[in-house]
Amino acid sequence: MPPSPPRPPKFPGSGRPESPNWGVWVMVLLIVGVLAFGFFTPESFGLGPRKENLESFEAQYKAGRVVLNDPKAPVEVVLSENGSEGVIHALVYRKEIQPKVEMTPFALTYSMSLPDRDKPLLNELSGYRVVESPYRTEEGKNVSLIPEGAQKLSVPEFNRLALEGRIAGGKDGIILAEDGNQNVLVGQIVTRIWPAATGDASVDKQRFERVEVPFTLEFQGDRVKQLLGPDTKFKRESGSWGGILLNLLPIVLILVILFFMFRAQSGGARGAMSFGKSRARLISPDKNKVTFKDVAGISEAKEEVWELVEFLRNPEKFRDLGATIPRGVLMVGAPGTGKTLLARAIAGESNASFYSISGSDFVEMFVGVGASRVRDMFEQAKRTAPSLIFIDEIDAVGRQRGYGMGGGNDEREQTLNALLVEMDGFENNSNVIVIAATNRADILDPALLRPGRFDRQVVVNLPDVRGREQILQVHARKVKMAPGVSFERIARGTSGFSGAQLANLVNEAALLAARKGLKEITEAELEEARDKVSWGRERRSLAINERGRRITAVHEAGHAICLLKTPHSEPLHRVTIVPRGGALGMTMWLPSDDKMHQLRSEMLDQLVVAMGGRCAEQIVFGDVTSGATGDIKSATNLARRMVCEFGMSEKLGLIEYGEHQGEVYIARDLGTRSRNYSESTAELIDSEVRFLVDSAYERAMAILTENRDKLDILTEALMEFETLEGSQVMDILEYGEMKNPPARVTPPPMPSEVEEQPGKDDSGHNEKKEAEETRADGAEERKMEEELEQAERAPFSYNPVDEFGKDGGEKK
């Protein structure tokens, strides 16, 4: 009976579509509600009562615009709980509503002996006229000023009408007459007839509006009582449940918001309340399209990890033989060699749950968080077993314990202890396989590397020439590549490139082709991209005068001739005097294959090639420049390694001198470095290094002196064409001329140099024709200048002080 396949895991997004996060929306709405409640009131939108001061309300009260006798909307005075403040709630007529006015005569008789508080409030009137008698003489008869049918008023009634503004003021409206010990007031009572409430809310809203009049009881209480009458009742705010709930509403909203915030943050893997939760991400095969077909150049590493995939697919094949799958696989290699890509391919090929996490995700500022995340990660992996856990950059958490400035009680060490226990502790987690990647395996803790934890170490090296060719072919599938492109040639010229650098090379070639307007990527774009990735972009805009270009041409010609005349050197690929990166010129060679070993004779020829530029300057100019700084440095380093590391000195023998400069790791190297040889040995080392460099200089001088005519021809060719291929340089050395000279390549214009299409302007001038005439004149002038220059150049003399300072530095 065939074994049943493992249960496929449940990946995110494989089931029903996720429902929207209602908690987040509720939280947002609650926040908006609290802000609206705190910063906005109904009055802000014109929905609540209108606020008025006491003076304005008093004026409306006297004008009769305050509704007084409506039982549905009575005038109320509400005091605060402490009784120091109050608010008048009233209904008033809008300004556009005008009443119908009727006049009724009145008469008031009162004793002059009354106290002032009981006398009429004449000050509330706008004016009155005083006469001596309540009678007037008409046709010889005394006629009373009190009209017939006049309403008799008492003093309180008069005062009330005066406060309500219902006494018609003015000198002609009120007459005050003295009658013995009595005073008589005669005037008109104003009766305003307002439109009554209809009961229709829309109609009444157009007639009335509510107002609130705040006042202080201590200073304005008596005035309010006098205005509204002595029978005015003051009531305090009631502590009803509605008011209490209204006051508690902001607090309740804030608590609800905090609840949803903590719930939302604790629900995610990166929530603020989930410090101890694992940040491992479950990789879905629907989203991960990388397979082993996308991984090239590391065949041995693919075979090592393929066993994991095969075991997960068919475990009985291994169990029948008693074999167990490795508990952990550690992938070690330089940056960019494809360790993470290999892990993604495992995730794409296997049917098991695949968790991915970075080593830095375990370490936080809080104590115990890292260990808690390790335990939670393995708990998740056990629930979906069989499963794979990929830890990228494990050196962030797996450094050797007991070292460093933090001592032995570091938070990172607690995390590492938890990881060690989970991988191979008291409990058996055979269904959880850990895959880790690092480029610093030398600093990992030994307990992490022992069998039972990381049983297998897979070394992912830099690809060889065949591997680089395969990697280029993989990345070329993603772009439009022209037919006939030799990936083998590009692979030979990219020795030491990692997979990531090769991917970047193909992408740069695609960008160059797009910049040139090409439909396909040719080999020329790949080579140009290779040069750009290795040494930088061409700097044709660098301002170099004719003398500086000639110095560079002589220097590079010396390198090229020495490269071709030394038997153990690599084949010449290209010579250029176009500035690129930090160099003013460059001589490039193309290795036939990757060399795992280097002979002493090959190193000696490298020293000769390095000295070729300085020797050419000495031969042609009779002096030297500072342009050979990098050559001298590289030659000195190579010669010192030959003496101190490779044992290629007869006088010093097969002994390594000097401490090996490995990876700097503070937990293993806290002291200062010291030499392991004496001063006399140091002098002998220096003499041997000097001997190797001087011997190479003499060989280079002899080669260039013998080929002086070829040096001049190659220099002139570089001055004319700027860049020469290796075959063209070989033609010059063999035949004295090039059989297939290169075409003059015009570099593409910079974006800032792109001008508008020439044409005719408004004045009728033909700009295109004028531009062509200007270019022709300029070409003729340049030709005349070159002829004069050639006449002055024979014989050529050069003084380095003109171009460089006396100390050899570049002239500013």
Curated annotation (Swiss-Prot):
The chain crosses the membrane at residues 22-42, 242-262. It is an enzyme of class 3 (hydrolase). One of its GO terms (molecular function) is metalloendopeptidase activity. One of its GO terms (biological process) is protein catabolic process. It comes from the Bacteria. Acts as a processive, ATP-dependent zinc metallopeptidase for both cytoplasmic and membrane proteins. Plays a role in the quality control of integral membrane proteins. This is ATP-dependent zinc metalloprotease FtsH. It comes from Akkermansia muciniphila (strain ATCC BAA-835 / DSM 22959 / JCM 33894 / BCRC 81048 / CCUG 64013 / CIP 107961 / Muc).
